[in-house]
Amino acid sequence: MAFNMKNRHLLSLVHHTEREIKYLLDLSRDLKRAKYAGTEQQKLKGKNIALIFEKTSTRTRCAFEVAAYDQGAQVTYIDPNSSQIGHKESMKDTARVLGRMYDGIEYRGFKQSIVQELADYAGVPVFNGLTDEFHPTQMLADVLTMIEHCDKPLSEISYVYIGDARNNMGNSLLLIGAKLGMDVRICGPKALLPEANLVEMCEKFAKESGARITVTEDIDKAVKGVDFIHTDVWVSMGEPLETWGERIKLLLPYQVTPELMKRTGNPKVKFMHCLPAFHNSETKVGRQIAEKYPELANGIEVTEEVFESPMNIAFEQAENRMHTIKAVMVASLA
């Protein structure tokens, strides 16, 4: 069946087919090779892209900006302090204004309904740079990274997301694995597993793709034989430190340690993280947590020993944000 990625939104990957996702991954690989070889051709000359950031960002902003510049496009960075968005002007009206000035819009913020509203009213492609529910550009980068670090066919690659699995990373890793026919495992305390309706939807996708889905509290079952272990921060930075106690108590058994990596039984297992990671007490937040919870001085969701080991491929993963975001924009806007 033919498909056309021109003018397509990227909101969650729910509505992308397996073939379309694989096309974006192949294009990402090709664009990455061209950049390294110095043979990249600019496909987005004359294009203007708005970058709306209601949440702070390092990787997503840099990835969108560099990807756009590499391809000849111009970007405008918009944050809540420099715009009327949400204060004097609704997102619906903002979408209708920006859609008349820009060829594409990126949004990084809170509710999935906001990026959906942008897509409904902008009249131009909208790209989700992160919402509370989904992180699709990160997923493309994660799968590209796993492909690069594993000799197996995509359908034979196994990975686990471990920790607080009801966030955008847990949701999105479950979704893309189900779409692509992979062996995907989600592991965490029962209270912090993905919502049942999302799991049910992904199980339907898995039947179509041949994916194997495991959602469990059982750490040994989840990590056995996996090729990759993913995790993410345990608590959102907006939450006060005094609320962390119960969450830390729940999640401490799911901390990624050298012992956990060994429990996979796979000497080639790799560690992945969307970053930023709290792997020591060198950051302001890390120091605050270590003062209150001394047992976490050597890392929260992942220990320093794992993070600084050759098992960690999070920085290649971060670089691939740029290549995959570039592919999304080229496929939609070129």
UniProtKB/Swiss-Prot annotation:
Disulfide bonds listed in the record: none
Entry's Gene Ontology molecular function annotations: amino acid binding; ornithine carbamoyltransferase activity
Subcellular location: Cytoplasm
Binding residue positions for carbamoyl phosphate: 57-60, 84, 108, 135-138, 274-275, 321
The organism's place on the tree of life at top rank: Bacteria
Enzyme Commission number, as recorded: 2.1.3.3
Keyword annotations from UniProtKB, A to Z: Arginine metabolism, Cytoplasm, Transferase
Pathway the protein contributes to: Amino-acid degradation; L-arginine degradation via ADI pathway; carbamoyl phosphate from L-arginine: step 2/2
Main location: cytoplasm
Known function: Reversibly catalyzes the transfer of the carbamoyl group from carbamoyl phosphate (CP) to the N(epsilon) atom of ornithine (ORN) to produce L-citrulline.
Name assigned to this protein: Ornithine carbamoyltransferase, catabolic
Naturally occurring in which organism (per UniProt): Haemophilus influenzae (strain ATCC 51907 / DSM 11121 / KW20 / Rd)
Gene encoding the protein: arcB
